[in-house]
């Protein structure tokens, strides 16, 4: 093999090796990295659809880990008309829209003002809607069985 052919072969090897490295890096980006999001969601009766006159409020804070699709939050509420009868996470639904619940929170403290922590694992199909802020929580009471407090879950 002459000198020019060997040079060309070496250049080809370098290009091929670089291409393999580039593909490996690109693939690992899409299959191994996760994103961590902070989550918040103030809630009140005005966000319930249809709205109600509750003076109760709620604050949701936490994070979402896309590698294991886990939403981990603390929910504080105060001033409800009575203790919660249920707390749900609904979606997908934009602000001002309703949808069926996807998660039922358990071990809810039976107090008109309280705090609880929870984790919910989302499916891959649900994750896109969650990241698009299309999930909400609501707190139900005996006086407001369709929901006394609602808050959109917002990821940052």
Positions of predicted regions on the chain:
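Metal-centered catalytic cores of metalloenzymes
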Residues: 23-87, 91-156
